[in-house]
Amino acid sequence: MAMTDPLGDMLTRIRNGAARRKSSVSTPASKLRARVLDVLQAEGYIRGYSEVEFGNGKAELNIELKYYEGASVIREIARVSKPGRRVYVSVKSIPQVANGLGITILSTPKGVMADHQAREQNVGGEVLCSIF
């Protein structure tokens, strides 16, 4: 059966893996997922990720989760824009997460980026998810 929300599935795998204190989780690979993971890594929410290719043309992303003193660095991770209800914002209305302690990840014409980068580049876009 086809997956209706691949990005939402990846975020759920990360949330569940962190709740179970897993060292890593895996998810099917896609360009959008890899770009979101790049932002999560740059912002310090995951240790890193690697892409593993299989012989049948399929690939998987292995995500290394990050912990601080035994607790997950990610307290909350939520999908904002969903397949049935897309959420677009201008640069002036980019939401702040936890009064600036968390980040919002956006898909913009200039690529996938965190909220503070979008404000610096003066660009809005689709709000993919929020992390705290």
Curated annotation (Swiss-Prot):
Q: Which gene encodes it?
A: rpsH
**Keywords, A to Z?**
Ribonucleoprotein, Ribosomal protein, RNA-binding, rRNA-binding
What are the GO cellular component annotations?
A: ribonucleoprotein complex; ribosome
Q: Which HAMAP family match?
A: Ribosomal_uS8_B (MF_01302_B)
What's a GO biological-process term for it?
translation
Q: One Pfam family, please name it.
A: Ribosomal_S8
Q: Which GO terms describe its molecular function?
A: rRNA binding; structural constituent of ribosome
Function, as annotated? One of the primary rRNA binding proteins, it binds directly to 16S rRNA central domain where it helps coordinate assembly of the platform of the 30S subunit.
What is the top-level taxon of the source organism? Bacteria
- Name used for this protein in its record: Small ribosomal subunit protein uS8
Per the record, the similarity remark reads:
Belongs to the universal ribosomal protein uS8 family.
InterPro entries in UniProt: Ribosomal_uS8 (IPR000630), Ribosomal_uS8_CS (IPR047863), Ribosomal_uS8_sf (IPR035987)
According to the record's subunit comment, the protein's assembly and interactions are: Part of the 30S ribosomal subunit. Contacts proteins S5 and S12.
